[in-house]
Design a protein with these regions (language model features):
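Conserved short "hinge" loops at termini or chain/domain junctions
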Residues: 1-70, 92-116
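Elongated alpha-helical scaffolds
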Residues: 75-84, 88
Length: 116
């Protein structure tokens, strides 16, 4: 079964314990934007991931309401994307020193998983 953008969002929310609607800490728009950033970051580390079904893509735009769309990156990078989006969320909360340290941990995890 194909992974969707909504699957990534759901997993990120579970990791960050932000999965009780409607009181989300991070908005859907922010998380979808972070997914776009994560794909661009993955492409910078692993340029070959820009090929989707043998076709070179120029990046991913995640429009609002696109949660049912198929995630355009190989499933082996799912946890890397989750870690990167968690990093972006916690980085936004960087006034809290603990969150800043945790954000760095997630960024390092994302980088490691992207290089596998």
């Amino acid at each position: 079964m194909a992974m969707t953008i909504g699957d990534i969002e759901k997993r990120v929310r579970a990791v960050l314990m932000d999965d009780v609607p409607p009181d989300y800490r991070w908005s859907e728009a922010f998380i979808l934007g972070a997914i776009e950033d994560g794909v661009a970051f993955l492409h910078s580390i692993r340029p070959e991931t820009r090929y989707v079904d043998g076709i070179l893509t120029d990046g991913v735009k995640v429009p609002q309401g696109a949660k049912d769309e198929e995630f355009p990156v190989h499933s082996r990078y799912r946890e890397a994307m989750v870690a990167y989006v968690a990093y972006k969320c916690l980085e936004r909360d960087s006034a809290d020193t603990q969150n800043l340290n945790l954000a760095e941990t997630y960024l390092n995890k994302a980088k490691t998983l992207m290089q596998v």
